[in-house]
A protein has these predicted regions:
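Short glycine/proline-rich turn/loop motifs
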Residues: 2-3, 89-99, 122-123, 199-205, ...
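Short, contiguous alpha-helical
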Residues: 32-87, 121-169, 177, 213-218, ...
């Protein structure tokens, strides 16, 4: 793959925007919030801020001569699973560490932002441009992780800066869309950024298949619940049924029943389930059980990629399901 070199001002703008968005996500937190870990599968907010900065330091060390890391002790705590940089700290115990402190992490975040900004104002090699692009995408991933960790941590006590009124989705008529099979090219073959798991581009054979025109809705999933879906082992994989019993699952995470009505809790507070919204916060096991109950199945990775990205008119894939234009800030 030949690496594409991004224009200097484009990469710098992307980096600055990304760092600003991360800080925006934690802007309304109290200091006591930053170090709390509410479950083994979440991470404290301060860890996310430190980790994305630490990865930027990894990139700096690979692109700048004689680069010295800010702190070896920081590296031990902020490493996630990169064994070449030492033994990672146990994810389930990230919230047990009081050091580095919140103030130290915020100072570290600001320092690394300045260091990378200085570098991005100078000419870069294609390899360096690729690595800094990777670190930007990596931070965007952690923004997503940070949001769902904050929901688990604070629920409707969290006050996002950009929280807007939720638009009620329209009621759509469900239909199955027929997707023709044949040879389909998966993966990436361009000169821009991609993760290594997208390489190499390769051909796969798909049979004809059908896929619904919109994701499973709250209404559809509620039908599964009310039909005893969580009480009938025949819909569940063995490990899934064990999880149902062990964790006492009876509905998606954040759902609760009040009288005869179902509610969910999110950043706007407790509200009635909107029947037309896509169901969220279900596990793989729950998704599989629903599909078996509905007489359907989950799409394969290749099927979903073709259904979501293939454009018949131009005979090629789009970058996003809606086209090639990047998502807006909202």
């Amino acid at each position: 793959m030949t690496l594409e070199q991004k224009p200097q001002n484009t990469l710098l703008k992307q980096f600055e925007d990304t760092r600003s968005r991360t800080l925006e996500l934690v802007k309304t937190l109290e200091k006591d919030d930053f170090g709390v870990q509410t479950a083994y599968f979440t991470s404290p907010p301060k860890w996310h801020l430190g980790h994305v900065s630490w990865l930027n330091e990894i990139v700096l060390s690979k692109t700048q001569k004689n680069y010295e890391f800010y702190s070896e002790e920081f590296s031990k705590y902020l490493n996630s699973y990169y064994n070449q940089f030492g033994k990672p700290h146990d994810k389930a115990k990230r919230g047990l560490m009081s050091r580095p402190t919140v103030d130290q992490i915020l100072e570290y975040y600001d320092l690394i932002t300045k260091k990378v900004t200085d570098v991005l104002q100078k000419p870069l090699t294609p390899e360096a441009s690729y690595l800094f692009t990777m670190s930007i995408h990596h931070e965007c991933q952690h923004q997503e992780l940070l949001v769902y960790d904050l929901q688990h941590l604070l629920g409707d006590q969290y006050r996002p800066v950009r929280l807007t009124n939720i638009e009620k989705p329209p009621s759509l008529e469900q239909e199955s869309i027929k997707i023709p099979g044949g040879i389909y090219k998966m993966g990436y073959s361009g000169n821009g950024f991609c993760y290594d798991i997208e390489l190499p581009e390769h051909k796969v054979h798909l049979d004809d298949f059908e896929i619904e025109n919109f994701p499973v809705t709250n209404f559809q999933y509620l039908e599964f619940i009310e039909d005893g879906g969580y009480n009938d082992f025949s819909f569940w994989l063995s490990d899934g049924w064990d999880s149902v019993k062990k964790n006492e699952w009876s509905a998606p995470m954040y759902w609760e029943k009040d009288g005869d009505e179902w509610f969910t809790r999110d950043f706007v507070g407790k509200r009635k389930i909107n029947p037309n919204e896509p169901v969220c916060h279900v596990s793989f096991y729950e998704a599989m059980a629903f599909c078996k109950w509905a007489g359907k199945r989950l799409p394969t990775e290749a099927e979903w990629e073709k259904a979501a990205l293939w454009d018949d008119e131009r005979n090629s894939k789009t970058i996003f399901p809606w086209g090639d234009e990047p998502p807006t800030k909202n």
